[in-house]
Amino acid sequence: MLVGARVLLGAPRGVGKTFTMLEEAKPLRDEGVDVVVAVVETHGRAGTAAALVGLEVVPRLTVEHRGVVLTEMDVAGVIVRRAPQLALVDELAHTNASRQRTEKRWQDVEAILDAGIDVMSTVNIQHIESLTDVVHKITGAPQRETIPDEVLRAAREIEVIDVTPVAAGALASGLVYPAERIDAALSNYFRLGNLTGLRELALLWLADEVDSALKNYRAEQGIDSTWETRERVVVALTGGPEGDSHPPGATHCRPCGRGELLAVHVTGQDGFAPPTRGLWRQRSLVESLGGSYHQVIGDDIALVEFARAANATQLVIGVSRRGRLARRCPVRGSVDGHRESGNIDVHIVNHAAAGGRFTLPRMAGGALTVKRRLSGLALTLILGPLITAVLVTFRSPDSITSDVLTYQVLVVLVALVGGIWPALLAAVLSGITLDYFLVEPLFTVTVDKPLHLFALALYITIAMMVSYVVDQAARRTRVARRSAAESELLATIAGSVLRGDGALQSLVSRTRKVWVEGCDCWMPRVRPITPTRPPGADGQTAADHAVICADGEPASDDRVVLVPVGERATLELHGADLDASERRLLAVIAAQIDAALEHEALSVTAREVGPLAETDRVRTALLSAVSHDLRRPFDGGNQKGGWLALHRDDPVCRRPGGAARDRRRKPAHLSVLVTDLLDVSRVQAGVLGVTVRQVDVEDVLPRALDELGVGPDQVVLDLDAAVGPVLADPGLLQRVLVNLLANALRFSPEGAVPTIDQSFGDTVQIRVTDHGPGIAADRRDDVFVPFQRLGDTDNSTGLGLGLALSKGFTVGMGGELDTEDTPGGGLTMVVTLPVASADADANADRPGGSRASL
């Protein structure tokens, strides 16, 4: 351990700790202290080298490490040959190149201290073992040389060499790094944010060291009063659902998230109660917030004693879950906690579990609850004897009227509280008691007199009338509460869907809180789940389904309700028994969940389509610009090539090897590519000009064949003379046929001649058939996408625009272009065009605009 050493702790590199160590050593030398420099790294800094002047430096050892000659501190020279009073050792976390004696420099310092020599050393904050990961996150620079915290904390004195981040100007002036490395350092390690973070980290680490020393002093002196030297928050955990809100609430009590967080769970006197799942969850939450978990045995006062022993400044407790009667009584634990806390601030955190959960009033059963009926029965059995005792005490012949009315009040009161059955019991008992104790002859029950029968009938009639009114009022009240609860639930659900973010989880959580113990929303990966085919049926396994979201945990019983959520998911509720009205309400919630799923799907699609649309817009603009800019020089090249071909006999224009012909052909090919690019941009912009008129396919096909240079033996034409003209643009139709026939010729094997035929009905179909390799069914839509070649590596045949343009041209003319399999193998391109009607002459040469898109 570094007992007796003085360590200068710096935050960033170049903060001046080595310079400070050398400057502090000079006054000690002047006072007569024997000081030597055991090892100091100047890193080429002029200021550090100048500070070394006048101090004795122990010569270093020369060692060879992996073929490189290095110098290390001569520990034996310092201890044996020199033996000073104070040795200056730089870079405490340094790893020795030659590990014959020790691996780390701090181990060499321990040896020097054991020899009775005082040591002053330096280290940077990034080399402390517990902080290396944090520094790596801040600066992005990993650290391989470290020193254990316990070794450094054992030092006699640790001083932070602090400097404000604005001192980065020293770096810019060349005091830390040479000029050629300044810009790189300022843009990486020495950014203002990095310097601020490292500075705070160094101060906090030293504050922990000071706090540890303070704890030891308080323990030695027996001080148990609170010293608010550092914010320390103690939070009580119960393991119940209300405890989940305590740790986050406690973090708000720490200024800027600093200070110490201690979570305490108080167990019973025996201490054998096993920890619950909720307590484990809360413990993990506390540890994720940077706190520590503790468990004590005792009662509420033990919590206060722990807080006082930990020198806590604040205590966070929660509101207990209590019934209505308990809410009217003082809470002994909370009151005692307030009284015994002393200088510790006590915070009471509220939570959702304190007020109970939102539930829908059940419509099944009678209008009055069992609790109310039992309350009415209790009133009959308690107030009846009390009233009888009072009336018997003051019994007289003139009090019979008041006696009857008193019992009548009891019957009405019982009817208001408990309904008809307790009221009927109260009426019968009141009549019998009145006749037995208060009507002559006493202590006998005789109901043969009309008056007695009338009184008993009156009691029963009044009880039934009042009970009926109470029952109807209770029924209407229940319906009103149910309607209000449903309205509140639907309003909350609708608001969750409108807010969008987190709507699905909010809906599922709300559903669980209303009805059940667990609520999962399952989405099948293969096929939709229906109530008749739950997960696990028909060979499906859990792997066939993906849980979109869940809330709570499935109940232990087998009660499961499956509700379809549109065609995309199923809502699965565990531990629920629902009546018809609740199922109707659940269907509305399922519709809202379906809307939330659709909203999320649309949001994902929008995020995916947005960049694609922007890319397509830029590409279209680029194609248009390039096409227009390149067309003019290509036209000029074509003209020059044509002139050379025309004057090929001129000796001045002769070129060897048919150069004039090649010179004309290549610009022509490039001109076709530019024209295709321009047409693609027009089709994508929806501004392709189309002139639709009557066109005879037999007139267009020869021109297409001539353009390709195809002879009669290279293609089979199977045209029906009965097929009439079609409505199309002749130029565009020719380009479509040229593109389709060119592809058919290119992909047809040798000896297999492409076929062009046509058929008609309501429309005319032109079929271009080849016997090539064909295209997989799942990739046929891709052939109509611009710049798609589907594995064609022949870059001399074009840019992959032919079929895309053919699709756009055909749709622009009011037709369709589809793909079919060729019997025996291959691909058939089918061009479908409308037949020219009898009145088509009236609309001949009708201009039109393309609505096609790629």
From Swiss-Prot:
<dbReference type="Pfam" id="PF13493">
    <property type="entry name" value="DUF4118"/>
</dbReference>
<dbReference type="InterPro" id="IPR003852">
    <property type="entry name" value="Sig_transdc_His_kinase_KdpD_N"/>
</dbReference>
<dbReference type="GO" id="GO:0005524">
    <property type="term" value="F:ATP binding"/>
</dbReference>
<keyword id="KW-0812">Transmembrane</keyword>
<dbReference type="InterPro" id="IPR027417">
    <property type="entry name" value="P-loop_NTPase"/>
</dbReference>
<keyword id="KW-1133">Transmembrane helix</keyword>
<dbReference type="Pfam" id="PF02518">
    <property type="entry name" value="HATPase_c"/>
</dbReference>
<feature type="modified residue" description="Phosphohistidine; by autocatalysis">
    <location>
        <position position="628"/>
    </location>
</feature>
<dbReference type="GO" id="GO:0005886">
    <property type="term" value="C:plasma membrane"/>
</dbReference>
<feature type="transmembrane region" description="Helical">
    <location>
        <begin position="450"/>
        <end position="470"/>
    </location>
</feature>
<dbReference type="GO" id="GO:0000155">
    <property type="term" value="F:phosphorelay sensor kinase activity"/>
</dbReference>
<keyword id="KW-0547">Nucleotide-binding</keyword>
<keyword id="KW-0418">Kinase</keyword>
<feature type="transmembrane region" description="Helical">
    <location>
        <begin position="374"/>
        <end position="394"/>
    </location>
</feature>
<dbReference type="InterPro" id="IPR038318">
    <property type="entry name" value="KdpD_sf"/>
</dbReference>
<dbReference type="Pfam" id="PF02702">
    <property type="entry name" value="KdpD"/>
</dbReference>
<comment type="function">
    <text>Member of the two-component regulatory system KdpD/KdpE involved in the regulation of the kdp operon. KdpD may function as a membrane-associated protein kinase that phosphorylates KdpE in response to environmental signals.</text>
</comment>
<keyword id="KW-0472">Membrane</keyword>
<keyword id="KW-0808">Transferase</keyword>
<dbReference type="InterPro" id="IPR005467">
    <property type="entry name" value="His_kinase_dom"/>
</dbReference>
<dbReference type="InterPro" id="IPR025201">
    <property type="entry name" value="KdpD_TM"/>
</dbReference>
<keyword id="KW-1003">Cell membrane</keyword>
<feature type="transmembrane region" description="Helical">
    <location>
        <begin position="35"/>
        <end position="55"/>
    </location>
</feature>
<feature type="transmembrane region" description="Helical">
    <location>
        <begin position="409"/>
        <end position="429"/>
    </location>
</feature>
<feature type="transmembrane region" description="Helical">
    <location>
        <begin position="158"/>
        <end position="178"/>
    </location>
</feature>
<dbReference type="InterPro" id="IPR036890">
    <property type="entry name" value="HATPase_C_sf"/>
</dbReference>
<feature type="domain" description="Histidine kinase">
    <location>
        <begin position="625"/>
        <end position="837"/>
    </location>
</feature>
<protein>
    <recommendedName>
        <fullName>Sensor protein KdpD</fullName>
        <ecNumber>2.7.13.3</ecNumber>
    </recommendedName>
</protein>
<keyword id="KW-0902">Two-component regulatory system</keyword>
<keyword id="KW-0067">ATP-binding</keyword>
<dbReference type="InterPro" id="IPR004358">
    <property type="entry name" value="Sig_transdc_His_kin-like_C"/>
</dbReference>
<keyword id="KW-0597">Phosphoprotein</keyword>
<dbReference type="InterPro" id="IPR052023">
    <property type="entry name" value="Histidine_kinase_KdpD"/>
</dbReference>
